[in-house]
């Protein structure tokens, strides 16, 4: 019937937007399983670096889970007053009471951090809470208060697992378009040479690694079902999109992908004199289902905003009208000594350069990735606290980890074609990425031990001196301390943070 797209037409249309070529998938199939095993074993090797603590922004994210699970309310006084001292000193008076400014008009404690991380942690934490209560009956006497070690360890390991899933789903997407060795290099390169390790291992209670997972899940499902998605699959995509927004509000920018797909389906290319069109009624139904499930999935955010702020649409962040929309810091956000994305994590330069190449590989995926990055870039550059206050690199862009992996894989693939052999490209790319990873690990070490300030601009001359002189001298001793006397080390780092705040008047987010 006129206006209805057949299955064959859908398959043809997928080819028309440069779907992954069959020869790529076949030539890489024997390496894909090996890729995923390597990624998994690398992940297992890094697990001892997981740091089970709740600190800074993580206090707000974790409070939703702990307060709901243990106290059965959204009263966060206990969470805030029990937090790390550098978090408390700017929020409480000398008598140990939260300052009046910490309360909203509804009488609840201001908690502008998103509820999404608590949703992702909840299944594991419910099991842990039940286990702690059960163990208590047998005389274990572990405090079932959400602060004891089993809870913190479970939270940290859960975050690490979600971070790994972000990488796993990202490499699954990339392997459809590029040769397996190149996708493994791209994935490991972005994983280890970006800001992701800080929010996977050192600060697992923050939202960024979890955000990367939800973006990867959304992109993976969108790519897997695009152009032939059923109404039910549109509903699932809407739910995943809502989860993505619950975890990190700017992630809704990723809706660019289904929007582009919708435009393509409504205005497809004409073939053999027979234009392929989609029923307007069918498109409207799918769009309605997607929007409905998207907003339904956001209900946890709407409810918590309503309770805390009195409106489901109040976020607690600076009003959009106060943002720097007409004067975004487009260069500073990339190159500033104050957590510039490219200056702190230069591997992302390669990833962004690869995004236009991705357009040539697959139009929808490539254009969606480019537009998403540009929109995200402008959005964060317009945000008053664009540098992230306390941040390694520009932490806001950790959400785009899957897109960066695709961009780097596209660049490596183009390089391999230029050289004429994949093995040559791998041989050259491996040492380059290894150097970027070593540089990043040394930089993270400096940042974590406060050899460079966690807030504000750093001195590049001092940082470079540290990389070549101080880091090699200290790394063995400090790593030993991290694994054998971690609590003592964290207290020392916390005290340094307090001293820095008192001197410079800095604040937590």
Predicted regions and their residues:
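Start-transfer (signal-anchor) and selected internal transmembrane alpha helices
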Residues: 1-49, 53, 155, 165, ...
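Transmembrane-helix signature of polytopic, membrane-embedded enzymes
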Residues: 32-39, 133-145, 165-194, 213, ...
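Transmembrane alpha-helix segments characteristic
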Residues: 35-42, 185-191, 239, 289, ...
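Membrane-interface alpha helices of multi-pass inner-membrane proteins
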Residues: 44-45, 65, 186-188, 232-248, ...
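Aromatic- and kink-enriched transmembrane "portal" helix at the membrane-lumen/periplasm boundary
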Residues: 140-166, 181, 187-217, 221, ...
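Specific aromatic-rich, kink-prone transmembrane helix
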Residues: 169, 189, 210-241, 257-258, ...
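Membrane-lumen/periplasm interface segments of specific transmembrane helices
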Residues: 257, 264, 268, 284-356, ...
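Membrane-embedded, lumen/periplasm-facing catalytic core of multi-pass transferases
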Residues: 390-391, 429-509
